[in-house]
From Swiss-Prot:
Pfam families: AAA_2, ClpB_D2-small, zf-C4_ClpX. CDD domains: RecA-like_ClpX. SUPFAM superfamilies: Glucocorticoid receptor-like (DNA-binding domain) (SSF57716), P-loop containing nucleoside triphosphate hydrolases (SSF52540). Belongs to the ClpX chaperone family. PANTHER family: ATP-DEPENDENT CLP PROTEASE ATP-BINDING SUBUNIT CLPX-LIKE, MITOCHONDRIAL, ATP-DEPENDENT CLP PROTEASE ATP-BINDING SUBUNIT CLPX-LIKE, MITOCHONDRIAL-RELATED. GO terms for biological process: cell division; proteolysis involved in protein catabolic process. The gene is clpX. PROSITE patterns: CLPX_ZB (PS51902). NCBIfam families: clpX (TIGR00382), PRK05342.1 (NF003745). GO terms for molecular function: ATP binding; ATP hydrolysis activity; ATP-dependent protein folding chaperone; protein dimerization activity; unfolded protein binding; zinc ion binding. This is ATP-dependent Clp protease ATP-binding subunit ClpX. ATP binds at residues 119-126. The keyword Lipoprotein does not apply. Component of the ClpX-ClpP complex. Forms a hexameric ring that, in the presence of ATP, binds to fourteen ClpP subunits assembled into a disk-like structure with a central cavity, resembling the structure of eukaryotic proteasomes.
Amino acid sequence: MSKVGTSDSKNTLYCSFCGKSQHEVRKLIAGPTVFICDECVELCMDIIREENKSSLVKSRDGIPTPKEICKVLDDYVIGQGHAKKVLSVAVHNHYKRLNHQTKHNDVELAKSNILLIGPTGSGKTLLAQTLARILDVPFTMADATTLTEAGYVGEDVENIILKLLQAADYNVERAQRGIVYIDEIDKISRKSDNPSITRDVSGEGVQQALLKIMEGTVASVPPQGGRKHPQQEFLQVDTTNILFICGGAFAGLEKIISARGRSTSIGFAAQVLAPEDRRTGEIFRHVEPEDLLKYGLIPEFVGRLPVVATLEDLDEASLKKILTDPKNALVKQYQRLFEMENIELTFADEALGAVARKAIERKTGARGLRSILESILLETMFDLPGLEGVEEVVISREVVDGTARPLYIYADRSDRAAESSASA
């Protein structure tokens, strides 16, 4: 908007809000007396979205409806419609129970903790994180593989509550309404059918230790963390109203479910699909408590997780959406990196499909998308800072398959020929 002293740039326009020139941004929108760039418009949209989210949480006595929760989950998590419905209803009922437990004393509503079962990279952790963000409650994550029974080397179960307290800035009241997500819960399954063979301090022992805090107890938490020791003051945290969400890939559970299905489907009319003919996520939909018991979870622990949400394998269409649709989508992140070099990065639609298929072949789900893109763009990102005149880099399906190099388009339109074609 303002003019610069040099004759070369006296007609350069600037954003009235951030001060960037028209050459530093994609778009500069003119008003009667001001200019605003596309980046500032995006920032304004983010602020409005955050305001809308906070107003959503404050509506209806602080409890968004299941449909409202599910709608916000759709903005962050691609696919998994069934799991979103299960989670939305469970979380809505949980916080409705908290808000009304002092109003009606005739019927006591029990807490419903949640178990998420799904393949690697299907969105279990992201769902739990997004729920906490929607509800504006303290949230912490714990890795079940690091937990051991009290008195053994490893992390005490009560340290989970300490982390939640830290997330709540040591506000005990807020922490007591928070959400705890315990990942890799399948890794603490019982290591043997006979629990008396050895002392299983990281398997069944951890399940036993988790029982109390999941059901509801007053945990004595050391304020500075670590092991308890005498002459130490403890913080008392009631875990009765803390929502526990446990997640795991449960590798091998599909075989247990399929075996149970085969035993009940016999006769000439029975249609039995081989395990390889069905996707893991589809098989998980038929999970029963008895399957979890056979997997190695103890009956008391399964009883503390009455709500089970199963996630399906992400198909090619879902993985393509994950690459491009979310606000912090991977493709947008790499495009931003290239923009810093004043170069446009373009992915052909067939290239995105090829990336998605690679992730499916590797069975890494959404988690494996970044490593695939990193390997595709490695040579380009290595060479790019030293290349002169490159205006655009195009990634085709052949580049993803490894049969061609990225197409470099130069600013001089008479020489659009690329450094590309064929290699292998």
